[in-house]
């Protein structure tokens, strides 16, 4: 028995023994959930689940997924690079990158998948319940539920007319509204309209412009209708829409310790809001190619202001964040007879997403000197960034890097389920499910030099030096020939004719790095669970699901026309952007199953053991060349021992589980040049988790939930793209291998390392000259390392105290939340270690005895500490910085709610 197993057993036995004493108290309430496609108490289910009623959601101040992650130990949620969101449960989650990658955690609304990024923004308004199912849920929830399910169950209409409104105001000019209204039309038709809106000022100051950003401006609405069709059938309709338009962060900042060779030191983390040393980077090379500089050995960010705090930033522009999402569901419930019922469900969802970030997280103060500094011509022009239908234009006189993400998705799901309720010992849930989704995802990085290279007409040298001869030309082929390859004695028109270069300009969409991914995903499944009462106190569950998944990935990646092999000359000559993808189709089918046995020790105590599996579909890697590079499916199996207990005459709820998770082919992403590669890695995760509710008296309650987990990567090695030879220090100064600094190198304590166009190599190379890298690095053994985003300990402890008076009840709640330090990469490097998180939250609510209103005051993050949320490694092409999200500062406010 390992240490974690002994710890789990000791805690369980000790906890139950300690609280076997009598405590005068009221009884805990059981929560009814639909985790098995039918209504059952949490206490009767042989699986680990935390469920929050509408009252729990309000009490815990769970407004969105980020709040839920604070309340549920081991649940980690954060935004990712691009348009996505990453989730992990129990120390395992979504470590893959790319539009074709499905998450390891299913986020759902009323049982059907909901885009994980959309639901993170929308949050929880007018909900009946939020269920967090931990561990594989492959038999009932399908193709990617390898780590768990987060299911939001929305409130349904009632038979009585009436409504509720809640108003909230707080610091940062917070103004929030939640309301709903029930309107029965007839005895058999009921409707409910819910609405939410939130506005909040920004929490971060841009010291360059003086503007505040990272604000919130969003609203959402939901229409629900239930129609009784006879005595045995009900038709349920739900339509939800959401919109946000603000300047909130996607990725919050960039950490870097500027380094003359690497860009950012791979040895130390550095400070936030710090740009990489641009010498030898992709941007520096293209500054030279674009005739904006006479060398690639120049740091554009030397002398740039650094603000070492999350509360401030130094940006050319504040971020833009826009999202609209719609989700509609039609559900038909029919009682076939006394023993069988049927549920047929169809849902349709759409999403439009856009964001723009200042990707270098700094403002360069070094002007461009030009290819010929002696001319004295200012290097300044008016350039446009973005793409067709989005973006902006501005005066450009120094380095800058912008990021754009544009996404449109639509999906439809259909499901039919048959549920038995027989008097005999055997019952069933049987069903079929289908999914068809389309995801068009565009991700772009654009710099000043790439903007210049797109259209030579905007170059400051065009008229005074070349007499306008550059007009109509553009692209890397032209600029490479003009700057690096042409005889100096020839006039420009003669050079172009001699080289036979075609005349075209580069569309704004492709003036930089662009990865455009059109993903079509189809999934079909049949599933079922059988429940066998072996005796009055023992129950066996057997589940099985067959999935058939197909992912068609049409992907095109270009680094301007410098690396864009499939883009034809005929399209270049049109001056318009075209999509010329490589198509990859990955198909696989898989079985997932579940075996569970549970035994009632008494009416209020149950123990169980289960073995469950789930499979996540394979796909294609988003590499920088757009070539096919598939990855395999991810298969997870978990053995779990647990208990569900209500003790001490109903005053104590104690649920706990010990689990052993084995995953074959877990996706671990690594940066490769401008793209990403998802590696299939084996991993093991052991953990002990649980939650307890204890009434110490009629007016005093303790809530405690926890997770202790140990994760370990299996036998695997990969190249560290930020430190390819595993060096710990430089032993020589950085040396230019050519007069223009296109190729640079230095001696480290692990050998010589070369750099050009941002790429690192252990052998001489020159991407601009057509000489590729022959030795990209030495494999680093990560066997036995801890998984990223897997803190070893996290818990939440709350004290609830009611004060009763003749006029009403005042409830005081104080919560302490803790999460131990964790690693942000598979190398478990010190620079990627995230510090422990500690929060205190409080809420005080008054509710009169003879009225239907309440008033609350609350404070979150009382110590006003801000922590790193997640890490995301930047590409060496940009200098190897570390992107980071960060948590909100202290917030406080007042709430008033009333029903009518």
What is the meaning of each model-derived region?
Residues 536-540, 657-662, 679-826, 895-899:
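Gram-negative outer-membrane beta-barrel transporters
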Residues 228, 418-421, 427-437, 466-467, ...:
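Structural signature of Gram-negative outer-membrane beta-barrels, strongest in the C-terminal barrel
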Residues 245, 253, 405, 438, ...:
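Surface-exposed extracellular loop regions of Gram-negative outer-membrane beta-barrel proteins
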Residues 439, 445-454, 702, 711, ...:
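C-terminal beta-signal and adjacent terminal beta-strands/loops
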Residues 26-160, 641:
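Acidic, small-polar-rich N-terminal luminal/periplasmic segments of exported/outer-membrane proteins
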Residues 204-212, 249-314, 360-404, 446-514, ...:
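Solvent-exposed loop segments that connect transmembrane elements
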Residues 102-104, 116, 125-134, 139-221, ...:
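Outer-membrane beta-barrel translocator/receptor signature
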Residues 331-337, 341-347, 352-357, 600-616, ...:
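Membrane-embedded beta-barrel scaffold of Gram-negative outer-membrane proteins
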């Amino acid at each position: 028995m390992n240490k974690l197993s002994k710890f789990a057993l000791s805690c369980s036995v000790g906890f139950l023994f300690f609280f076997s004493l009598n405590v005068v108290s009221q009884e805990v309430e059981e929560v009814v959930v639909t985790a098995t496609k039918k209504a059952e108490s949490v206490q009767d289910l042989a699986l680990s689940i935390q469920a929050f009623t509408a009252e729990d959601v309000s009490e815990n101040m769970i407004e969105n997924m980020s709040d839920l992650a604070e309340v549920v130990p081991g649940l980690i949620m954060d935004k990712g690079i691009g348009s996505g969101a990453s989730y992990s449960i129990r120390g395992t989650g979504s470590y893959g990158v790319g539009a074709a990658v499905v998450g390891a955690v299913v986020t759902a609304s009323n049982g059907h998948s909901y885009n994980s990024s959309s639901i993170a923004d929308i949050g929880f308004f007018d909900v009946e319940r939020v269920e967090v199912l931990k561990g594989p849920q492959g038999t009932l929830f399908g193709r990617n539920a390898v780590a768990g399910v987060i299911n939001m169950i929305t409130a349904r209409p009632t038979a009585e007319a009436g409504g509720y409104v809640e108003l909230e105001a707080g610091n940062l000019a917070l103004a929030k509204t939640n309301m709903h209204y029930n309107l029965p039309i007839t005895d058999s038709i009921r409707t409910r309209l819910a609405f939410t809106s939130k506005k909040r000022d920004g929490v971060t100051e841009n010291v360059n412009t003086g503007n505040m950003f990272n604000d919130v401006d969003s609203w959402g609405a939901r229409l629900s209708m239930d129609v009784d069709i006879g005595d045995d059938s009900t038709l349920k309709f739900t339509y939800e829409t959401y919109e946000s338009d603000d300047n909130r962060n996607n990725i919050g900042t960039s950490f870097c310790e500027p380094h003359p060779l690497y860009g950012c030191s791979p040895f130390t983390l550095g400070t936030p809001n710090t740009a990489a040393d641009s010498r030898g980077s992709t941007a520096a090379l293209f500054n030279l190619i674009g005739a904006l500089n006479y060398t690639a050995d120049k740091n554009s960010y030397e002398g740039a202001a650094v603000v070492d705090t999350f509360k401030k930033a130094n940006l050319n522009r504040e971020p833009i964040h826009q999202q609209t999402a719609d989700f509609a569901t039609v559900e038909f419930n029919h009682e076939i007879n006394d023993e069988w019922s049927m549920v047929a469900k169809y849902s349709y969802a759409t999403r439009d997403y856009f964001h723009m970030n200042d990707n270098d997280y700094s403002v360069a103060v070094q002007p461009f000197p030009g290819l010929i500094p002696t001319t004295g011509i200012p290097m300044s022009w008016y350039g446009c960034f973005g793409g067709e239908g989005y973006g902006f234009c501005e005066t450009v006189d120094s380095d800058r890097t912008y990021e754009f993400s544009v996404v449109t998705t639509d999906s439809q799901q259909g499901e039919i389920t048959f549920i038995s309720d027989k008097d005999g010992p055997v019952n069933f849930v049987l069903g079929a499910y289908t999914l068809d989704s389309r995801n068009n995802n565009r991700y772009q990085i654009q710099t000043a030099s790439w903007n210049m290279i797109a259209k030579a007409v905007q170059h400051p040298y065009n008229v005074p030096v070349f007499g306008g001869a550059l007009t109509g030309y553009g692209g890397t082929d032209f600029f490479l020939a003009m700057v690096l390859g042409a005889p100096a004695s020839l006039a420009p028109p003669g050079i172009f004719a001699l080289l036979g270069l075609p005349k075209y300009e580069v569309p704004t969409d492709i003036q930089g790095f662009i990865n455009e991914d059109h993903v079509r995903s189809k999934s079909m499944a049949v599933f079922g669970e059988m429940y066998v009462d072996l005796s009055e106190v023992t129950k066996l569950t057997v589940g099985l699901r067959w999935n058939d998944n197909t992912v068609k990935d049409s992907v095109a990646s270009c680094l301007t026309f410098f690396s864009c092999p499939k883009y034809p000359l005929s399209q270049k000559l049109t001056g318009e952007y075209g999509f010329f993808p490589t198509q990859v189709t990955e198909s696989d089918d898989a079985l997932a199953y579940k075996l569970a046995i549970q035994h009632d020790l008494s009416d209020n105590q149950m123990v169980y053991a289960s073995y469950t599996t789930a499979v996540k579909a394979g796909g294609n890697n988003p590499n920088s060349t757009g070539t096919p590079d598939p990855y395999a499916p991810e298969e997870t199996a978990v053995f779990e021992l647990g208990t569900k207990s209500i003790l001490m005459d109903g005053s104590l709820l104690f649920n706990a589980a010990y689990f052993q998770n084995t995953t074959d082919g877990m996706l671990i992403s690594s940066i490769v040049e401008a793209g990403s590669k998802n590696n299939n890695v084996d991993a093991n995760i052991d953990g002990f988790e649980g939650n307890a509710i204890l009434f110490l008296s009629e007016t005093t309650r303790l809530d405690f939930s926890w997770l202790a987990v140990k994760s370990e990567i299996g036998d695997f090695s990969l190249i560290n793209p930020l430190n390819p030879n595993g060096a710990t220090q430089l032993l020589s100064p950085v040396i230019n291998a050519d007069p223009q600094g296109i190729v640079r190198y230095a001696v480290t304590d692990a050998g010589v390392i070369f750099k050009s166009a941002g790429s690192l190599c252990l052998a001489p190379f020159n991407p601009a000259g057509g000489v590729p890298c022959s030795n990209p690095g030495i494999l680093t053994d990560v066997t036995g390392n801890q998984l990223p985003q897997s803190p070893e300990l996290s818990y939440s402890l709350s004290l609830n105290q009611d004060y009763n008076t003749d006029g009403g009840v005042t409830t005081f709640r104080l919560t302490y939340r803790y999460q131990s330090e964790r690693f942000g990469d598979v190398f478990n490097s010190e620079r990627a270690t995230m510090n422990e998180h500690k929060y205190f939250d409080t809420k005080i609510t008054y509710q009169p005895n003879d009225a239907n209103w309440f008033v609350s005051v609350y404070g979150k993050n009382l110590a006003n500490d801000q922590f790193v949320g997640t890490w995301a490694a930047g590409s060496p092409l940009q200098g190897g910085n570390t992107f980071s999200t960060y948590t909100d500062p202290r917030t406080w406010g007042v709430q008033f709610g009333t029903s009518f």
